């Protein structure tokens, strides 16, 4: 998300952060990664607003953006030795099972597998 001046914003439900601080660390890293990877700018460049509903024409890209942000977040958390946050993220994604984790997003299983694969890399 961007503010009215085009500055990056991250909006997170505080309940999510208080309910599971470990998952909250992952979530914040994940959202930061969307900004650093250029995903947010891409959504605001116009194409994300075309079509019968928001993001309709970039829905295949949205799935990959989520996986890329997960990968980036795991790498950040590994670098700071926050293995509990990585585990919490995987467990949270597994709770979605074969259902998508959001509109046009990967399934929980896909995201959990991606998190585990990234965490296992050196």
Report each predicted region and the residues it spans:
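Catalytic zinc-binding patch centered on the HExxH motif and its immediate surroundings
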Residues: 1-9
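Soluble periplasmic/extracytoplasmic beta-strand elements of cell-envelope proteins
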Residues: 9-11, 26-27
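Second-shell loop/turn segments in exported
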Residues: 14-18, 54-63, 99-102
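Catalytic Zn2+-binding segment of zinc metalloproteases
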Residues: 16, 22-25, 31-48, 79-81
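Post-HEXXH active-site segment of zinc metalloproteases
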Residues: 39-66
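An active-site-proximal "capping" alpha-helix that borders the catalytic cofactor pocket
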Residues: 61-80
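Long, well-structured alpha-helical subdomains associated
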Residues: 78-122
């Amino acid at each position: 998300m961007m503010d009215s001046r085009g500055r990056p914003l991250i909006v997170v439900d505080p309940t999510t952060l208080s309910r599971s601080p470990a998952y909250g660390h992952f979530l914040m890293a994940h959202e930061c990664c969307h900004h650093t990877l250029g995903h947010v700018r891409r959504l605001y460049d116009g194409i994300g607003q075309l079509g019968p509903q928001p993001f309709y024409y970039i829905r295949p890209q949205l799935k990959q953006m989520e996986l890329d942000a997960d990968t980036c977040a795991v790498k950040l958390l590994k670098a700071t030795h926050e293995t509990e946050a990585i585990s919490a993220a995987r467990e949270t994604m597994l709770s979605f099972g074969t259902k998508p984790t959001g509109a046009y997003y990967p399934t929980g299983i896909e995201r959990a597998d991606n998190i585990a694969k990234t965490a296992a890399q050196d």
